[in-house]
């Protein structure tokens, strides 16, 4: 009985009798263990509640648990912090709360930064933009790269977030950084078919000539993935907007990029300036001068015009007759690229027939269009500098470009002459070959005429550029 009564009491360890001594040690040991578990359970329960609150996005419960002592930088599975998880689901409100509580915006786990997580999050662009803006305001590095050397701007470009791309650049993100495969943000946008991202990156100074590790440019990546509009856009050499936003301050860039459509319709100072130049030359060459004001009012650049679909033409008030002229000109500009270096010797010999002649014809036709464009701009250019209504840069800039054009035309003329001599040499060798069956004289004469016309056209284009250069120098 006494022993039984003793078992029911909280006896301390180290009693008199052997029985009570054993029981007392056990009771004392169990008491300390139970007290330790009781101290841990509330913390574990809080952590579980915290995880659930983060999962369902319960901001008030998250704040309550943070007030109760949960660390804002506690880690979840795989070592993620609450801020990284909130960024991964693009929960801007949770991101703001955690940052206000002192969460580390520069935290990384296995080369995965919180900013990269936000840029690659699944959610609306509006929410992703808010998260990225909050992280950048807490000095998150916009150029930090993951294990594959991809930066936040590459993820944003890949996923088609135009405003996020612009915001990152405004905070110092490098546009032309390349990942482990040589992809830039522009390459990723071209690969995924994000036309607006491509246009925006070109405005921000993206280099469309940078090649991947396997020697492909963004235009070739777009063509390989069947994004023909983007291929045409990147293949077109004129770029009136390239790098226009690079010289703006961070505040100006953010203002330009993040304005609403209504704001853009009200303010055309910037857009009108950038649209002036190549667009007018192109329209003059097609006899579509009457469209200049319409396109400038709608902030349509030359690149945009050349990549429009039929419904976009109609939406912007462009008549079917004018559409046909633009589409015909665009079709003439699309010369199918022939990669001679990738072909075998036998294939090269096969290419040198009708397809090569077609290539020369198209080249000759394009030179003719360039001559017409220069002639039009010469006739339209004011003789008196006081008649120029828009503010121009220093005339030296124009003359230096004209000098480069003249040099390029001279180089082109030299290469065409080399091509002509080479073909003439091959033709003479074939004529002197006794085993060769002579072609009809008409074909030979026709080929010679084509080559002569091409050479004359190139020389004429160089002469016109030389006149244009002298005109600028006189001014």
Curated annotation (Swiss-Prot):
Principal place of residence: cytoplasm
Gene3D superfamilies associated with the record: Ankyrin repeat-containing domain, Transcription Factor, Ets-1
GO biological process: cell differentiation; male meiotic nuclear division; regulatory ncRNA-mediated gene silencing; spermatogenesis; transposable element silencing
Occurrences of domain SAM (ranges): 272-334
Placement of ANK repeats on the sequence: 45-74, 78-107, 110-144, 148-177, 181-210, 214-243
Record note on quaternary structure: Interacts with DDX4, PIWIL1, RANBP9 and TDRD1.
Protein name per Swiss-Prot or TrEMBL: Ankyrin repeat, SAM and basic leucine zipper domain-containing protein 1
